[in-house]
C-alpha cells in the first residue's frame, strides 16, 4: 500500500497538528543553494547535488562570499524560504511538489529536499546548513506532508469541488466584464452615429424637424400593428417564438442567472488540481543518510 509519508524508522511527531495547520514552525539555516536533478527521489541523487553545491560553496568562499542566512517556515501549506530580516519570500515550495527529504547522519547540520518547480516542472534539490537540527527539520517537513495529505483525503474532494465552483464563478465574472466593455464600445459608436445624423449640413436650407425645449426631436412611436382576424372569425394564433438563441440589439446573449453556477473548470486550474492529487499520491520519502565524507568546512 502506497503511503504518503515514508521513513525507514518512523519517529513520533514533535509538533502538534494545530501548530502546523494554523501557524508554522520556523527554523534558521544557511542556504547552500539549489540545483537541478534528474529524478524526484533517491539517495544518490541528493548526494550528487550536495557534492556539487558544496564544491560551488568552496569556490565562493575563496572569493570572500558568505553563505546567505534564511528562515524556513514549515506548515501544511508548504515550506517557505524567506530572508530573515526583510521576511521577503525567496521560494515557496508546496508540499505536494516535495518528493524527497533527507538529512546527513555524519554532518548533523546538512539537510536537503527535492521539489518540483511550479514554472519549469524541473526537479530542484535544495540544500541547507542548519544548527545541528537537520533531522528535526526533515521530520517536521514529513509531519507537515502527512497532515496535509490526510486533510486532502478527509475532504473527500470537497475542497476540489469548492475550488472548481469558485473558479467557474470567477470565469463567469470575467466573461461578463469583457461583455460589458464590448457593449460600452458599441453604445458609444451608436451615440456618435446618432449625433452625426442629427447635425444638418452646413449649407442646407431644408426645413428643420420640430424640436422640444431641449432641442431634441420628439419621440413618435410607431402605430402598433393590429392583427387581422382569420377567415373563420377566430383570433389568429400567437406568433411562434424563434428556436434560436435570443440576442439583444448588440448581438450579445442576454444574461441568464441560472447559467452562472459552477461552469466547466478552466483547463489550467484543472491541471493544477490534478497535479496536486498526483503529487500527494507519489508520497514523500524521508531518509537519514550519509551525503559525503567531507563536512562543510569553515562555516560562516
UniProtKB/Swiss-Prot annotation:
Residue ranges of every copy of the PID domain listed in the record: 21-176
GO cellular component: cytoplasm
Keyword set, alphabetical order: Apoptosis, Coiled coil, Cytoplasm, Phagocytosis, Transport
Parts forming coiled coils: 160-199
UniProt xrefs under InterPro entries: Adapter_Engulfment-Domain (IPR051133), PH-like_dom_sf (IPR011993), PTB/PI_dom (IPR006020)
Highest taxon, organism lineage: Eukaryota
Principal location: cytoplasm
Gene3D superfamilies: Pleckstrin-homology domain (PH domain)/Phosphotyrosine-binding domain (PTB)
UniProt cross-references to Pfam families, sorted A to Z: PID (PF00640)
Statement: the UniProt record of this protein carries the keyword ATP-binding: no
Biological process terms in GO annotation: apoptotic process; phagocytosis
Purpose of the protein: May function as an adapter protein. Required for efficient phagocytosis of apoptotic cells. May play a role in the internalization and endosomal trafficking of various lrp1 ligands.
Annotated family: Belongs to the ced-6 family.
Protein name, UniProt field: PTB domain-containing engulfment adapter protein 1
